[in-house]
UniProtKB/Swiss-Prot annotation:
Phylogenetic placement of the source organism: Viruses, Duplodnaviria, Heunggongvirae, Peploviricota, Herviviricetes
Pfam families attached to this UniProt entry: Herpes_ICP4_C (PF03585), Herpes_ICP4_N (PF03584)
Biased composition (Basic and acidic residues): 988-1007
Biased composition, class Pro residues, residue ranges: 66-75, 273-285
Amino acid composition bias (Polar residues), ranges on this chain: 878-893
Protein name: Major viral transcription factor ICP4 homolog
Species this protein is from: Equine herpesvirus 1 (strain V592) (EHV-1)
Post-translational modification: A long stretch of serine residues may be a major site of phosphorylation.
Subcellular location as annotated: Host nucleus
């Protein structure tokens, strides 16, 4: 604004004299301005339009000098004080002068304005510069008042700029600050009665004065930049007088055009800072020479009068009775109706924004002793200046500094220091909604709101939809702040939180009844997301931290940032609010009380937590834990005497309960030992582990059996010792209070040894059972399992190891049959023992052979508490596999993928009790495992004596889904089928028996587990099981290599005995079993096998094929299509050199019969599926047989790691093993359907199952068999399919042209209907449909169903995972080659592989039709669109056209234009007719 420019009114005195203004007009003009009237002419130039002074700044009745109140007041800035001669004349530092006694203001009226002008003008002595103003001593500024220099920040026109110390500016090298002129209100008289907060707030209240806008304008654009005056060394030594609010003496007022730093608007300069301007600086004068302009002197005088009046009126008023100032707020900020009117008069906007209390004492301090203060910006104006100034009077250094990073625990107020507009609570019956101060009707009685309020009261996390009717928003705000700091996906949750059913209903209710009736989508609601409460709650509380969720949600809602940029902004918000959310004390430690000082609810909780008694020293706690251990395990004479009393019978815990507690004690001892070893770095450094210090048991075993509570107390005490040792390791270096000496560690070891020696008899002197039941070890076993089982095992471990509840009863009252999951300690503490892997109550578990030696007592026990030593991983893997494969019935029938030790023993025991069929209340599902799918029985190897005689089934150490009920077998009375598998004999297996033959040395694949290797089938049972016509005799030895396959066969021997003396019934060769045994008929002699291709089929994929169930007479379910995972269809497509799509003949869903792979079998290639019977045994059998003959087997593995069966085949490194990924996404038509130019391209590399892998395999085959015919893996002749064509429902394709003519043409012999002939022979069909020959002329040339060969692009390992075509960086010429190339069907052609980094060196192959065979272009139907591929000679004719491949139609089938183009050409049809002359024009097969 013009009024705020520093060059305004260069000579006010000359201006008044030249306009002949008298005293009376000026006084009348000022009085009219005070009353709110606007003068029409000259007076309006001085007061109204120029906006220099408002009526509340300088009332005309204000005396020139004011008598201070009882408490000393600062001197007015316009007061007169004489300089000492030395200061005036020499320019050195001024000496302190006595304060002038002010006159009484009562009898002296205010002089007229003209008289004041003459008085001030006459008082200026020539050559003296300007006089000291309003201070009793030079060096104005209050050392104890942080805002003493606030008046200096409001410079007036015609005053020089003061020099600022280096600490008053944020950077020493910063450019000159912008000009900040005074902003004084010139509003009407109604603004004088307005409270200081409303008038100072220029953005919130509608009644704010125009000075706010003027002030903001001056901040942005109406300011000038001038160089800062150089600092004076003399001024640095100028002492300051305390209590003076005026400018520093010895310095001059800022001159016209001088700049005031913006950083000092609110008192940034140090109160005791050196005097800004040098004393020796000459006084500024007019351009023509002379003294300072009188206009500047007038302005300075009036400013001093205003300062004096402000000092009088801003005394601390006494609050009304019963009315206390709110904490953190200045006591002057009272409600409007309670503020004295005098406190509002005479205060400018800047003074109202920073009210200063009257200092009680005036002390003089030298300038060099005053502390330097930090820069205060406008953002810090919300903090209470009054409180800070009062504290500064007592301690100047503490008040003058504003420590960075320490959050002021005060409400966040407006820049003027007032509460935010709209902070008042909404009216009765309404809640906040919309803009500032707006509200809407409350909906407390609505059922949706009532339910939401109940959910909000019980929620521990932020609710996804919040409305004010749900209750206090403090809980929601605090939860949102925690989520912003702790959640990785905070922004995603704020923007798109997942809504449950009830929350979704609430969101729809809010949209319908709250948001929709109130306008469009951009209507102001007060929050940008459903979880956020209204921002008015945060404004009313003055809580700056609650703005964090709103800021984060606003950024999350924005579409101008991507995910990474939003993450950066979120991290920035976290760092900016970190000191507020997690404050620290002066020492840098987290201050929990300071963190919640501004929030009553959190403060109460923090205070309660601070009042808790301090924990004893670690050494004391170690001794107490040792005492509890000895007391808990010691002999209890009272209990023993009560038990020995006649007629009394004390309750005794069950054996299961004791076994649980014994395992818990073992794990507790192991936890303490681990902590001690980590603390000391080794066992030799742990004191107390000396054999001579091993203590004796605390009580005999029989006393321990009646003391389960003592066992639990001992275990809890050991875990407490573990925690103390861990704290010593983690905190001992930084905090000596947590350190443990040698004596404490020795006592901890002593406690562990006491527990160990006392509990050892209870666990039969063996800790293997407890180790197998450790919950952490169970999870570790799960995550280290093979990829196909890791998901199921981990899920099973997590579900079974549920966290213990806090409401459980003590262990002494818990039933003995319940698994131990941790209960309250004897002292009533809430500590619980870590959960154990549950076991089946009352069951005997067999032992597992391990490298750890077992005592004779344990090995002979056969049962009891110590028999729980089976590793839990077996049960976990069993249940994980059975659950994970219930959705794949075909795969679930494979013994490799679904074996379990529990099923193994149960299925061979028809006499198992019904209790074994459901464990822990989980009945067997309909799709559960069949009894023929056992798991390795090696878990019973240690109990061979009881294996053959016990009628009970094997029960794992962990609960698993129980095996299904045995099928009803047709057996003779008294006949019971034997079990097929048993433990490995001690003397070793028989060579004719059934067991795993795992090669020695390293293997390409994971080695089977010990349990799988320990399974054994006696030779007499093997001979009976494999003697069946279903199994070719040459391949029967492979069955003996797979005990799981033998168990599967035994489970299906459910019929009556085939002959006398047979142990098993007759084998029921069902359809699934035949499909699984079909691989044995591929190659009759195992000696002819040279290459084995391993694959994992998708659901309902097998080499037998068959009609799908959707067709009449079909029984096979339609296989599932997958774009990501490849099965048998993808395997055969790669071996057959063709593209696999869902509509092509290569997909199993289109098969109507079994595919023909005899061409591959003739080359010695065996296709073996993971679901085939004896998959593991076949591979190991071939490896052994060929290795014994000194031949190497070539194994191509296309099974993904997730599908590799547990205990799969072990392939020795002696053989050649190649592994590659099998996926339909190698075809660009599947990966990028929209890239039409790549529809006939296929990606290949050495890691993909395709030509890249085949090239390596063919080279290795040539080295292994140099005299044999070369291996050809990627040829069209390798595979033939059985599909539905116009030649028949089960047509083998490709159908040779001769056979095609024999099967199709006779149907149209003698047919006179040419339209029927054209439709039946497919004259107007596309030449190729989904890559296969479809039209009559194409079938007559290459055969019906013959497929086009793809173009392979060698993309390398990185290109195989490309997400977009641009990542491949395909050259333009190569892309054009793929678009134009059309490789005609050729059964013996090699694959065309082109490097993706080079342009092709050959012309793209085309299809050319001879004259007389229709159109010269070839029509190709792919993905519902027909393309016309022109022959090569026409390529040069259409350079300027659309290209060689033109997209004609976008819907399935040929377009009318294509059909019309085909009809124009001569159509030649060969038919056998007796009554019609057939010419050459109708025979398309003539060459």
């Amino acid at each position: 604004m013009a009024s705020q420019r520093s060059d305004f009114a260069p000579d006010l005195y000359d201006f008044i004299e030249s306009n002949d203004f008298g005293e009376d007009p000026l006084i009348r003009a000022a009085s009219a301005a005070e009353e709110g009237f606007t003068q029409p002419a000259a007076p309006d130039l001085l007061y109204g339009s120029q906006n220099m002074f408002g009526v509340d700044d300088a009332p005309l009745s204000t005396p020139a000098v004011v008598i201070p109140p009882p408490s000393p007041a600062p001197e007015p800035r316009g007061g007169k004080a004489k300089r000492s001669p030395s200061a005036a004349g020499s320019g050195g530092p001024p000496t302190p002068a006595a304060a002038a006694q002010p006159a009484s203001p009562a009898p002296s009226p205010a002089p007229g304005l003209a008289a004041m002008l003459k008085m001030v003008h006459s008082s200026v002595a020539p050559g003296n510069g300007r006089r000291a103003t309003g201070s009793s001593s030079p060096g104005g500024g209050d050392a104890a008042d942080p805002v003493a220099l606030d008046s200096d920040t409001e410079t007036c026109p015609g005053s020089p700029q003061p020099e600022f110390p280096s600490s008053a500016s944020p950077g020493g090298g910063s450019p000159a600050p912008r000009v900040r002129s005074i902003s004084i209100s010139s509003s009407s008289s109604s603004s004088s009665s307005m409270d200081e907060d409303d008038q100072a707030d220029g953005a919130g209240a509608s009644s704010s004065s125009s000075s706010s806008s003027d002030d903001s304008d001056s901040d942005e654009g109406g300011e000038e930049e001038t160089p800062r005056p150089r600092h004076s060394q003399n001024a640095a030594k100028t002492p300051s007088a305390a209590g003076s609010p005026g400018p520093s003496s010895g310095g001059d007022r800022p001159a016209a055009g001088a700049a005031t730093p913006k950083s000092c608007r609110s008192g940034a300069a140090s109160p005791g800072a050196p005097a800004p301007a040098p004393a020796s600086a000459p006084a500024p004068s007019r351009p023509g020479g002379g003294l300072l302009p009188p206009g500047a002197r007038i302005l300075e005088y009036l400013e001093g009068v205003r300062e004096a009046n402000l000092a009088k009126t801003l005394e601390r008023p006494e609050p009304p009775a019963g009315m206390a100032s709110p904490p953190g707020r200045s006591p002057h900020r009272l409600p409007k109706d309670q503020r004295p009117k005098s406190a509002l008069a005479g205060a400018s906007k800047r003074k109202r924004a920073n009210p200063r209390p009257i200092p009680q004492t005036q002390t003089q301090a030298p300038a060099e002793e005053a502390p330097q203060t930090a820069v205060w910006d406008l953002l810090d104006m919300n903090s209470s200046q009054a409180t800070g100034a009062a504290a500064a009077a007592a301690s100047a250094p503490a008040a003058a500094s504003c420590a960075p990073g320490v959050y002021q625990r005060e409400p966040l107020l407006t820049p003027s220091g007032d509460p935010w507009p709209g902070s008042d609570p909404p009216p009765m019956g309404r809640v906040r909604y919309g803009g500032t101060g707006d509200s809407r009707d409350g909906l407390w009685d609505d059922p949706e709101i009532v339910l939401a309020a109940s959910r909000y009261a019980e929620a521990q996390a932020p609710v996804p939809v919040f409305v004010p009717e749900m209750g206090d928003s403090t809980k929601q705000y605090n939860a949102l702040v925690r989520m912003v700091f702790e959640s990785r996906e905070a922004m995603s949750w704020l923007q798109n939180s997942k809504l449950s059913g009830q929350d979704q209903n609430l969101a729809q209710f809010c949209q319908k009844f709250i948001h929709a009736p109130r306008g469009h989508g951009s209507f102001i609601t007060g929050s940008v997301a459903n979880p956020l409460p209204h921002i008015g709650d945060a404004m009313a509380a003055g809580n700056a931290l609650w703005a964090l969720p709103h800021a984060a949600a606003s950024v999350a809602m924005s579409r101008r940032y991507d995910r990474t940029q939003k993450s950066f902004i979120l991290q920035s918000l976290r760092r900016a609010y970190a000191d507020m959310a997690y404050p620290r004390d002066e020492a840098g430690r987290p201050d929990s009380l300071a963190a919640v000082a501004g929030y009553p609810a959190q403060a109460a909780a923090a205070a309660a937590s601070q009042q808790q008694p301090e924990a004893p020293a670690p050494s004391v706690r170690v001794r107490e834990a040792y005492t509890r251990v000895c007391a808990a395990l010691g002999p209890r004479r009272k209990a023993a005497a009560a038990a020995a009393a006649p007629g009394s019978r004390a309750p005794r815990p069950s054996a299961f309960r004791l076994r649980e507690l014994g395992d818990a004690c073992v794990l507790a001892c192991q936890a303490v030992f681990e902590a001690l070893l980590r603390l000391r770095g080794g066992a030799s450094a742990v004191p107390g582990l000396d054999p001579s210090e091993i203590p004796s048991p605390a009580c005999p075993p029989e006393a321990l059996c009646s003391n389960p509570a003592g066992l639990e107390t001992a275990a809890l005490s050991l875990y407490e010792l573990r925690d103390l040792v861990e704290r010593a390791r983690l905190l001992g270096d930084s905090d000596p209070t947590h350190r443990l000496g040698s004596d404490e560690l020795r006592l901890a070891v002593r406690a562990v040894l006491v527990v160990a020696r006392t509990v050892a008899p209870l666990v039969r002197y063996n800790a293997e059972g407890a180790r197998a039941r450790a919950s952490a070890w169970t999870v570790t076993q799960a995550v280290f399992s093979i990829p196909s089982l890791v998901g199921g095992m981990l899920g099973e471990a997590v579900s079974l190891l549920a966290p213990p509840t806090r409401s459980q009863q003590p262990s002494s009252s818990s039933p003995g049959g319940e698994p131990f999951s941790g209960s309250a300690a004897a002292e009533g503490s809430l500590q619980t023992l870590p959960p154990l892997w549950p076991t089946v109550p009352g069951k005997q578990s067999a032992t597992v052979p391990s490298s750890h030696s077992q005592s004779p007592q344990h090995s002979q026990s056969g049962g009891g508490a110590g028999a729980t030593t089976a590793t839990c991983c077996r049960a976990t893997q069993t249940n994980a596999r059975s659950r994970g494969q219930q959705h794949q019935p075909q795969k679930a029938r494979s013994p490799q993928a679904a074996a379990s030790p529990a099923h193994l023993s149960q299925e061979a025991m028809p006499g198992s009790s019904s209790d074994d069929r459901a464990i822990h209340g989980r009945p067997r599902g309909k799709s559960g495992k069949r009894r023929s799918e056992p798991l390795e029985p090696a878990a019973q190897a240690g109990a061979s004596a009881s294996f053959s005689s016990s009628a009970r089934g094997y029960d794992p150490s962990g609960p698993v889904d129980s095996p299904p009920a045995p099928k009803r077998r047709v057996a003779t009375p008294g006949h019971q089928a034997p079990r097929a598998l048993g433990p490995m004999p001690a003397e070793g297996p028989d060579r004719r028996g059934g067991f795993r033959r795992v090669p020695r040395g390293d293997c390409h694949t994971p080695r089977p587990s010990d349990a799988a290797c320990a399974a054994y089938c006696p030779p007499e049972l093997v001979a009976e099981l494999i003697d069946n016509q279903l199994f070719p005799e040459a391949w029967r030895p492979a069955l003996t290599f797979d005990p799981q396959a033998l168990a599967t066969i035994a489970a299906r021997c459910s019929g009556p005995p085939a002959r006398d003396g047979a142990r098993f019934g007759e084998l029921a060769a069902s359809g699934p079993l035949r499909r699984r045994a079909a691989w044995m008929h591929q190659i009759p002699d195992p000696e002819d096998v040279k290459v084995v291709v391993l694959y994992s089929p998708l659901q309902d994929e097998d080499l037998l094929g068959g009609l799908p169930a959707s067709r009449p007479g079909g029984s096979r379910r339609e296989p599932l299509w997958s774009d990501l995972k490849g099965g048998l269809s993808a395997l055969l497509a790669a071996l057959g050199n063709r593209i696999l799509t869902k509509r092509s003949h290569a997909w199993a869903g289109n098969w109507t019969g079994a595919p023909d792979v005899s061409a591959l079998n003739a080359q010695g290639v065996l296709l073996l599926s993971t679901g085939d019977l004896a998959f593991t045994g076949c591979v190991e059998y071939l490896c052994l047989r060929l290795g014994s003959a000194r031949r190497k087997l070539l194994v191509l593995d296309a099974v993904s790691t997730e599908d590799w069966p547990q205990d799969g085949p072990a392939i020795s490194q002696y053989h050649i093993y190649m592994r590659a990924a099998l996926t339909p996404r190698v075809a660009c038509a599947v990966r990028w359907p929209r890239e039409r130019h790549l529809s006939r391209a296929v990606l290949t590399s050495s890691t993909l199952f395709g030509p890249g892998l085949f090239a390596r395999a063919e080279a290795a085959f040539a080295r292994l068999y140099p005299d044999s015919a070369p291996l050809r893996l990627c040829r069209s002749s390798n595979v033939a399919y059985t599909v539905d064509t116009r030649a028949g429902e089960r047509t083998r394709v490709p159908l040779a042209p001769r056979e095609y003519r024999q099967r199709v043409l006779p149907d149209y012999d003698g047919c006179k209907d040419m339209r029927a002939q054209a439709e039946g022979l497919g004259f107007h069909d596309p030449d190729f449909e989904e890559g296969a020959a479809q039209s009559h002329r194409a079938a007559n040339r290459w055969g019906l169903g013959a497929w086009l060969r793809p173009v392979y692009l060698a993309c390398g390992r990185r290109g195989a995972g490309a997400v977009e075509p641009s990542e491949l960086l395909i050259p333009e010429l190569l892309s054009e080659f793929c678009r134009v190339a059309l490789l005609e069907p050729d059964a013996e052609a090699e694959p065309l592989v082109l490097p993706i980094t080079e342009a092709p060196r050959r012309r793209a192959p085309r299809v050319d039709w001879e004259p007389g065979f229709g159109s010269r272009s070839t029509s190709v139907l792919h993905m519902g669109a027909t393309e016309l591929c022109l022959p090569e000679p026409d390529d040069e004719l259409e350079i300027d056209g659309a290209g060689d491949v033109e997209l004609v139609v976008e819907h399935p089938g040929p377009s009318p234009g294509v059909a019309q183009a085909l009809r124009r050409a001569p159509i030649k049809i060969e038919v056998v007719s007796d009554d019609e002359d057939g010419g050459d024009w109708c025979n398309p097969y003539l060459s």
